[in-house]
């Protein structure tokens, strides 16, 4: 038995983590990346040039790299990488240059460019997102995702978020960011502990910042949430 919830927008599609039940009756989380071979995902991704926004946190429930999984199953043509680099080895606040990994272009989004350029986006048809947030506002991965969504909207590129649970759960706590203090470290008026998964954040800013071209919804059963389903 599995619960499935997908939020659909003309720009944005979120493949939420789901809850499944093992033979012993125990619940376990199925990550968005765990579902890339399902028919719904294949309809979204097959036959398209894929970009992937990720780093070392992009792994499935068996700790297999999302980069390698997408490269194996689909046409992965470019990687887009936030602060700290592809493997988390770059110090906080330190910029890094674009490079290649296993013959795939790796575009730095924490160097000369903080946003994907039109030239970068020319390499892809769809941007896939699989990255782990930590559940607090002052973390630059959310900002990089927001910039990706804005530039993909301009270029009319679809964004598919492979969701994963918020490690701090779904509760919100702490002061809300004041507009006059917005920076790349905190772009939106969210509480310090925001309670959102990265997919929920993407859906939220797509609606509130009017990034996409209208919002619709669909799915079967329940799921999502700060706990992943």
Give the residues covered by each predicted segment.
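Bacterial N-terminal signal peptides
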Residues: 7-18
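N-terminal phosphate-binding or glycine-rich loops at protein starts, especially the Walker A/P-loop
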Residues: 28-74
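A short helix->loop->beta-strand "cap" motif at the edges of active sites that frequently abuts
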Residues: 74-75, 152-158
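Short internal beta-strands
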Residues: 77-85
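Glycine-rich, charge-decorated loop segments at or immediately adjacent to ligand/cofactor-binding or catalytic sites
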Residues: 88-93, 160-182
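Glycine-rich oxoanion-binding loops at beta->alpha junctions
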Residues: 92-124, 136
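Glycine/threonine-rich flexible loop motifs
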Residues: 133-145
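Conserved anion/nucleotide-ligand pocket segment
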Residues: 182-222, 227-229
